[in-house]
Amino acid sequence: MPSAKKTLVNQMDNARHIMLLLVIVFHLFVYNYVLNLERTRCDCSDNWQREFIKYYSLVALVISTSLFITGFSGSNVRLPIAFSLLFSLFGLINAFVIFFYTKNLMDAGSACDCSGGRVRTAIHYLSAFRVILTLFALLSAIFFLVFLRAFV
């Protein structure tokens, strides 16, 4: 029978793989949407935000896929802390950019029919959820740091 520690480590690895898979699916979804806007020459969606979203999603896909594949190979590869923090910061910025980008496209309404549809709406709400989740995690981390410091 495996020890409790080994079981916990396996469960954490499984959760990590599931999270990475969700990140990969989300960024594939976003990257495909942005590429479709470019292919259809949707002028109302053409700005710096679209370029930022496209390139960030591409980088996130490469990094997440690499971590996903190496995780299944048995390697316990982790990103360096500084790079992980930088990637997380840009991830939060990306979530805000996607949220406001899709909000502006939604506000344009019939003036921007080329960007419409359920995909845009889904990306908008997923990015809002991502912002809320990230802010909750940040506030939780600050709370635990303050709480733990009081007991040390």
Stretches found by the model and what they are:
Residues 2-152:
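Eukaryotic polytopic
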